[in-house]
Amino acid sequence: CDFEAMPAEETLKRHLGTFSKLLTTNQALVLSDYGKGGLSHISTMIAEARAVKLPILVDPKGDDYSRYHGATVITPNRAELRQVVGTWTSEASLIERAQNLRQALELDYLLLTRSEEGMTLFGPQGQLTVPAQAREVYDVSGAGDTVIGILAAMLATGMPIEEAVQIANRAGGIVVGKLGTAAVSYEELFG
């Protein structure tokens, strides 16, 4: 069990001012929800980031994604998405459920990470599936963090999301081929 105390409401409110100031000096926002209470103001954070036209990427947690309403993209894995939309029995069922969720939450995109099946980007024009990079898997620790981090960096440069997903997928494939949590070098990614 996890016995950490929730952050005090006053503490979180105090940090919102700092958050607002930082928005103008950054090109993307990544919010990783660990279900610890640190993102109790996530709706406000998303709205403020939207107002300054930042791409907002969310690594979701739990079974209520309504708090991520208006984000640019959320990046659940299969188990996380199942908690919210239920089990799908076919690819067509998955597409319908993912697109319905994306539309209900007014997300630009939903990026489903699918382990050995790669990832699928659900967007207004349909979906794009990017196959996993063919390599041996040694450790999946940090793969999701790598994917969202690289995706954010590419979107921050103005790269179209369809291209950014390809690079993020490549980065995820590189880190699972290493032991422990690992970084991806520029040479590994683009060399």
Role assignments for model-derived ranges:
Residues 20, 99, 169-173:
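Solvent-exposed alpha-helix faces
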Residues 1-28, 182-191:
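Conserved N-terminal subdomain of the carbohydrate kinase-like
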Residues 22, 104, 174-175:
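Short alpha-helical functional segments enriched in proximate histidine and acidic residues
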Residues 32-127:
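Conserved phosphate/ATP/ADP-binding segment of small-molecule kinases
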Residues 30, 45, 54-58, 64-67, ...:
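Extended, hydrophobic alpha-helical segments in both membrane/secreted and soluble proteins
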Residues 3-6, 80-82, 135-136:
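A short, flexible beta-alpha/helix-coil linker loop
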Residues 108-109, 133-190:
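Conserved post-catalytic alpha-helical subdomain immediately downstream of the catalytic base
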